[in-house]
Every structure is written in structure tokens, then in C-alpha cells.
């Protein structure tokens, strides 16, 4: 490496540890730890400019990991360009709602269940859209959403087979996942979905059976916990494929926090020793239309999430959530230029949390697409210099233009320094710079 002038990256997060430093760069997703040489590294990263000498192994390593960058590099302009283009992958992404009806009535749900099952005409239009546009992409990523998508299994099967055929014929990769409440996810239905190349599953279990029963119940008020857990256990015991993954989401209420140990025991009893099942813990939030004050009383505070991170690190930080803290890991699908939502009536949208807003409507599949409005949507969410996001060190992770619905930073990123500090306790997550005295 030739000698050159370098400077500290604008996207270094420095965590002070009792035995040294942890540094995480949000552009590269690299973490390093330094121990004996912590003061040396701290001084380098606090300098305005540094001479990068090939013989200085510490400087070379910091440069390789992105903690130091070329002196003339404009990192903010690079990120702005990426955000303007909205290109966060090589795949066309379709979020499809085969029905907007649901067999559950969750207390915090933002959906209104006003539309039914997707018609054959809309299905035909979706297949035609894939046929006409897939050539410019490496493949197709389909996410089945709802309502409850398994209430329209025939639509999923019919559409999947046709889209798979298009991708096979055009030599494109086909991936699929599904967000489901898990009630209809019997072993028989799971086998059907697996044959349709659906490999990623998100299922929600809201804690202890009694708490889950108060938050996630059937349309007729009946309980759902046991059915969901039995379905998951049967899949775990009978399906050995390593290509499937289950994200077990838990929406924590304030009440659930004091029962977390009991909940962990339930998870361990039923789903332990299987890396295909990963936890995703969030605090209950308001994504719209919640008017019942008793439901709002369930909401936790940022400090509650931080408590979960501190006390249950191994549950909160896993192979799935680590991806959220990597470059582009938290980019909302609605900010991706090549991602669209198609609801059961064929309306083209960007966000699944705002299905009835004209702001979130861009035409009808197979009939018209308002490209100008879509471009305005993308541009409106560009971060300007007056935004608190503009100089944020977390910006390369989410590019988030704080969600127009939530109007705040994601809880995961609000607690990012704590999460990174906990990650720095596991040697699998970092490289060591300099020397470390063996104790």
C-alpha cells in the first residue's frame, strides 16, 4: 500500500469498554476491538487527518475495515446518491396480499379488513408484470402478506406456480417468504408452501399464553396460542430441511416484561436446539388506527427495550437481528425503488401499514402506474441537511428518513450503542487490532 493521507470515517461508532475500545463502522459493517493499543487507536480516530503508512499495521487495518477512508472521499455524497437511486438490491420485490381478510383480531392491528380475496384478473396482471419486467433483475423476491395470507392458500398456490414458471423460463432466481399468524400453518399446509419455494416464515407469539390470548385472538374471540405452538412444534419435528427459517416475533407489552423468564422457558421447551427458529423482540407500537386507550397502555418505553437487550442479549442478538445492524440492514421496503405492494384489489402501493391512504396509492396493476407520483414519493423521503438523520452515524444502516407513519427512529437503532456494546462481548462479531495481553 502506498503512503497516502486518510481521515476517520464519519460513520464510526466508538464504544468505550472496561478493557479497551470497540469500533463499529456502519458503512462496512465491520467491528474491531482494541485492548493494549486502545489509546493509540483512539488518538488516530480523533485526528483530522492521518498519514497512512504501509508499515503501520494498526492504520492499515483501520483502513481495510473502513474506519479510515481516503482524505478526498465524500461519504455523505455517496450515501445521498444511493438514497436518490433507491437501489438496495438486485431483485424485483413484490409484497402480495392474496386477501385482506383475517381470522384474527389483534388488539394493536392497523388493518381494516375492507377487501377480500384477490381475483383471477388481478393475478393475471401480476404474472404479466413479472413477465414484462423481470429481465432487468437478477431475480424475484415475493413476500406474502395480508390480512392473513393463509386464508387464501389457493391464490398463493396458483400465483406462485405461475411466477416460478416465468422465473425458470427466464433463468431468474425465485425467493419467497410469508408473514402469517401461524394458526393455519399445519404440517400439511406448510408442506404445500414449502413446495412453492416459500422458505422464510414470520410468526408472532406475544409471550405467555394468557397474555397472547388477550392480544391475539380469533375473530370469534377464541384463544390461539396452543394451536400456533403445536403447528410450529410439528414442523420442527417433522421437517428437517435446513433451507427454511422461522422468525418468531414477539410484541412485548409492559405486562410481558416481568414474565420474560417464563416466556424463555416456553420457547426453550418447544423450539430450542434448532437454529432455524430465531427470536425478534419488539415493543408494541402504534402503526395507525389505535383509538382504544387501554391498548395504548400496553406500549412500553425505549428504556424497556434497552432492558431486554441488557438482560436477554442472546435472545435479542442473533443471526437475524445482526443483519439489521449491517449496511442497509434496516432499509424499509417502502424506500426501495424496486419494491411494490399489490393489495388484494390490485392497487399498487409502497407501504403495508397505510393501505387506505391516497398518498400511498400509485395506480392499479395491469392498468396504470403513476411513475411521476412514485418518483415524488422517493424524492420526498430524501434526507435534507436540516434533518436529524442527515449526519447520523446510523444512516448507512437504515437510510430511514424517519418513517412517515412512525415519525421516529426504530427502537432497534435507538438502542444501537447498547446492542453494539453487547455484540462486542462475543469474539465472533469482531476482529482484534493491535495486541491483547493474555490474562
Please report, for each region that a protein language model flagged, where it lies by residue.
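N-terminal [4Fe-4S]-dependent radical SAM core
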Residues: 5-33, 55-95
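Flexible mid-to-C-terminal extensions adjoining Fe-S/redox cofactors in radical SAM and related proteins
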Residues: 6-10, 355-439
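Active-site and channel-lining beta-strand-loop segments
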Residues: 22-24, 337-353
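Short amphipathic alpha-helical recognition elements used for nucleic-acid or partner binding
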Residues: 33-49
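Conserved alpha-helical substructure of the radical SAM core
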Residues: 76-191, 196-199
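Short cysteine clusters
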Residues: 102, 106-109, 332, 346, ...
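Short glycine-enriched, charge-decorated loop/helix-capping segments at active-site entrances
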Residues: 112-116, 214-222, 406-407
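Radical SAM enzyme [4Fe-4S]-AdoMet core and its adjacent flexible, acidic
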Residues: 206, 210-335, 341-345
Amino acid at each position: 500500500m502506498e503512503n497516502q493521507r486518510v481521515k476517520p470515517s464519519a460513520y464510526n461508532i466508538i464504544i468505550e469498554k472496561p478493557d479497551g475500545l470497540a469500533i463499529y463502522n456502519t458503512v462496512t459493517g465491520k467491528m474491531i476491538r482494541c485492548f493494549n493499543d486502545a489509546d493509540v487507536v483512539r488518538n488516530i480516530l480523533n485526528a483530522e487527518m492521518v498519514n497512512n503508512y504501509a508499515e503501520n499495521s494498526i492504520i492499515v487495518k483501520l483502513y481495510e475495515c473502513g474506519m479510515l477512508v481516503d482524505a478526498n472521499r465524500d461519504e455523505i455524497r455517496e450515501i445521498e446518491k444511493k438514497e436518490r437511486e433507491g437501489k438496495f438490491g438486485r431483485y424485483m420485490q413484490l409484497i402480495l396480499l392474496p386477501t385482506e381478510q383475517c381470522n384474527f383480531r389483534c388488539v394493536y392491528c392497523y388493518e381494516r379488513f375492507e377487501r377480500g380475496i384477490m381475483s383471477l384478473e388481478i393475478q393475471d396482471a401480476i404474472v404479466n408484470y413479472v413477465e414484462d419486467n423481470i429481465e432487468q433483475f437478477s431475480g424475484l423476491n415475493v413476500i406474502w402478506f395480508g390480512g392473513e395470507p393463509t386464508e387464501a392458500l389457493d391464490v398463493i398456490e396458483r400465483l406462485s406456480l405461475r411466477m416460478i414458471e416465468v422465473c425458470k423460463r427466464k433463468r431468474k432466481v425465485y425467493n419467497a417468504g410469508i408473514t402469517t399468524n401461524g394458526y393455519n400453518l399445519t404440517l400439511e399446509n406448510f408442506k404445500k408452501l414449502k413446495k412453492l419455494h416459500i422458505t422464510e416464515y414470520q410468526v408472532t407469539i406475544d409471550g405467555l399464553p394468557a397474555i397472547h390470548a388477550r392480544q391475539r385472538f380469533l375473530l370469534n374471540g377464541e384463544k390461539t396460542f396452543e394451536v400456533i405452538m403445536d403447528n410450529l412444534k410439528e414442523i420442527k419435528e417433522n421437517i428437517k430441511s435446513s433451507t427454511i427459517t422461522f422468525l418468531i416475533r414477539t410484541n412485548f407489552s409492559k405486562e410481558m416484561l416481568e414474565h420474560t423468564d417464563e416466556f424463555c422457558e416456553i420457547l426453550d421447551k418447544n423450539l430450542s436446539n434448532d437454529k432455524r427458529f430465531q427470536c425478534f423482540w419488539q415493543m408494541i407500537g402504534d402503526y395507525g388506527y389505535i383509538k382504544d386507550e387501554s391498548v395504548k397502555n400496553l406500549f412500553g418505553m425505549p428504556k424497556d427495550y434497552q432492558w431486554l437487550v441488557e438482560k436477554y442479549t442472546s435472545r435479542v442478538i442473533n443471526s437475524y437481528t445482526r443483519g439489521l445492524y449491517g449496511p442497509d440492514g434496516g432499509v424499509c421496503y417502502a424506500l426501495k425503488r424496486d419494491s411494490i405492494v399489490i393489495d388484494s384489489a390490485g392497487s399498487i402501493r409502497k407501504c403495508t401499514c397505510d393501505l387506505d391512504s391516497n398518498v400511498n396509492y400509485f395506480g392499479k396493476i395491469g392498468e396504470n402506474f403513476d411513475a411521476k407520483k412514485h418518483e415524488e414519493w422517493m424524492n420526498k423521503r430524501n434526507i435534507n441537511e436540516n434533518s436529524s438523520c442527515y449526519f447520523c452515524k446510523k444512516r448507512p444502516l437504515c437510510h430511514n428518513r424517519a418513517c412517515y407513519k412512525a415519525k421516529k427512529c426504530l427502537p432497534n437503532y435507538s438502542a444501537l450503542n447498547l446492542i453494539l456494546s453487547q455484540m462486542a462481548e462475543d469474539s465472533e462479531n469482531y476482529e482484534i487490532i493491535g495486541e491483547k495481553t493474555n490474562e
